[in-house]
Regions:
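Signature for phosphate-centric chemistry
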Residues: 1-214
């Protein structure tokens, strides 16, 4: 709620409310305060205008909103499917490089709003686990959603996803390891060599073969 903040910012809250929407102002100031964290050289902070409870409340709502907009919350529009073309491109490039048999590195730059749904579409564990009931939790009780998925762990500043491929000389078996923000992670695919996965199994999982999933 924005009542406390409005009283801090305005001498006459009643008059201010005629021109200012309290919740919208609170959210906008929160976004500015968050952006300041990306510019430590300025030495500025706005988080002190909020209480810890307010910061947590706004963050849980923002977390749920990001997940719902990406389609990760069960029952929401599956917007993450828009990133299927990106995942398919990653797969085709990997297959081409494997065929060519030469060491290679491919980079793709994007925004956090694209990295989040792509991480879900790949199957990274940090994006999984929201129960079906979370659709209602995300809409009416967003405080619950972060207990399952937290965007801070997926798309911090400079967030990134890496697929690292390995092949033993003379072998056709390609292994792949997944990294999220430089940390090893996993996908719901059976493997006998964790944290590595057989590339053929990963592709089958992406194609929707349920038998290969854990």
């Amino acid at each position: 709620k924005s009542d406390r903040l409005m009283k801090v910012l305005f001498k006459d809250v009643k008059k201010a409310k005629a021109f200012v929407d309290g919740p919208d102002l609170m959210k906008s100031l929160y976004n500015v305060a968050q952006d300041f964290q990306s510019l430590p050289e300025l030495g500025l902070s706005m988080t002190d205008i909020f209480t810890k409870e307010e910061l947590f409340h706004i963050w849980t709502g923002s977390n749920a909103s990001w997940l719902r907009q990406s389609g990760i919350v069960p029952g929401s529009t599956p917007m993450y499917l828009q990133k299927k073309a990106v995942r398919d491109t990653m797969e085709s490039i990997a297959d081409r490089v494997i065929r060519e048999g030469k060491p290679s590195a491919t980079l793709r730059f994007s925004h956090d709003s694209s990295v989040l749904p792509l991480a879900y579409l790949i199957g990274l564990k940090e994006t999984q686990g929201l129960p079906a009931s979370s659709m209602y939790a995300g809409r009416n009780d967003p405080a619950n959603v972060y207990k399952y998925v937290s965007i801070d762990k997926i798309i911090p500043m400079a967030g990134n996803i890496q697929l690292v491929f390995y092949r033993k000389e003379g072998s056709d078996d390609i292994l792949v390891k997944f990294l999220l923000n430089e940390n090893e992670t996993s996908i719901p695919v059976k493997t006998d060599c964790a944290p590595y996965y057989h590339w053929k199994d990963v592709k089958r999982f992406w194609e929707g073969h349920p038998a290969i999933a854990q």
